[in-house]
Curated annotation (Swiss-Prot):
GO terms for cellular component: extracellular region. Its main location: secreted. The keyword Transmembrane does not apply. Belongs to the neurotoxin 10 (Hwtx-1) family. 28 (Jztx-11) subfamily. This is Kappa-theraphotoxin-Cg1d.
Length: 85
């Protein structure tokens, strides 16, 4: 009886170590791939956005404001231009 319990515990321990190693290997490959993916996504988003130079006032044209903001000519501030991404 004691021998079968010890064998069962040993088998469970080996299975735990094997499953943990497989999970670490899988997670490691995700971490190796993710920096390249993040850099490519960063380039995509940077190419679509314009710089925010006059967000809180002092704008003269729409290009001074952030994306989806337009320059209001009366008070010279940036406000939503009613567009969606």
């Amino acid at each position: 009886m004691k021998v079968s319990v010890l064998i069962t515990l040993a088998v469970l321990g080996v299975m735990f170590v094997w499953a943990s190693a497989a999970e670490l290997e899988e997670r490691g490959s995700d971490q190796r791939d993710s920096p390249a993916w993040l850099k490519s996504m960063e380039r995509i988003f940077q190419s679509e956005e314009r710089e925010c130079r006059k967000m809180f006032g002092g704008c003269s044209v729409d290009s001074d404001c952030c994306a989806h903001l337009g320059c209001k000519p009366t008070l010279k501030y940036c406000a939503w231009d009613l567009t969606f991404p």
